[in-house]
């Protein structure tokens, strides 16, 4: 978040440090100006967050990042559209998973590797993971209005493990999954 860099907040890199990384060939990505919960903001406010951030990168580094990470990993269809309009070529959520050809470039998964989830075992799990290739996900928008939601997806043609599929909820444990051919619906 460029605001944190501008304010020289403790624990954040400075513009000078970012320039050093850039000069050494590292890629620099973006995450808005003030790091808000974007799905809660209006389209105009999100556009402003992205514009201000891009302007700060242009001023300080002479470039606009092409990659974006949603603050807190949160996004909606409206947020994705604004990120695309701002000129980014891809964006990352904060949901664990393996990217594959069925993922949209603006909903890429990433494994968190931090003090809580940064063990060697976790790194090995992430490196050796395989994608769950799905499409036709319902609901399309990850910001849900209905609780509990109706949720379903179709396994890609090269996935043949539908009978082994298990889904879990952090509060309720294992969920009932109805398998209808290649379609899975959580009920």
Segments from the language model and where they lie:
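Terminal accessory/targeting
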Residues: 1-13, 35, 112-187
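Metal-dependent polysaccharide deacetylase catalytic core of the NodB/CE4 family, i.e.
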Residues: 1-79, 89, 102-109
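Residues that line or immediately flank small-molecule/substrate-binding pockets and catalytic motifs
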Residues: 72, 95, 112-115
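Acidic, His- and aromatic-enriched active-site or binding-groove loops in soluble protein domains
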Residues: 88-97
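Short histidine
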Residues: 97, 103-107, 116-117
């Amino acid at each position: 978040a460029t605001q944190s860099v501008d304010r020289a907040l403790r624990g954040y890199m400075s513009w000078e440090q970012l320039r050093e990384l850039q000069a050494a060939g590292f890629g620099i990505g973006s995450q808005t100006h003030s790091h808000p919960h974007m799905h809660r903001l209006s389209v105009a406010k999100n556009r402003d967050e992205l514009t201000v951030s891009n302007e700060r990168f242009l001023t300080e580094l002479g470039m606009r990042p092409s990659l974006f990470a949603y603050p807190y990993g949160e996004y909606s269809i409206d947020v994705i559209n604004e990120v695309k309009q701002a000129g980014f070529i891809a964006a990352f959520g904060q949901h664990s998973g393996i990217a594959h050809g069925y993922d949209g470039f603006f909903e890429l998964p990433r494994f968190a590797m931090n003090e809580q989830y940064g063990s060697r075992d976790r790194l090995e799990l992430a490196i050796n993971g395989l994608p769950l290739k799905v499409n036709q996900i319902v609901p399309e928008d990850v910001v849900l209005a209905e609780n509990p939601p109706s949720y379903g997806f179709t396994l890609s043609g090269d996935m043949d493990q539908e009978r082994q599929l298990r889904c879990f909820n952090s509060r309720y444990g294992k969920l009932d999954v109805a398998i209808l051919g290649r379609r899975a619906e959580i009920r």
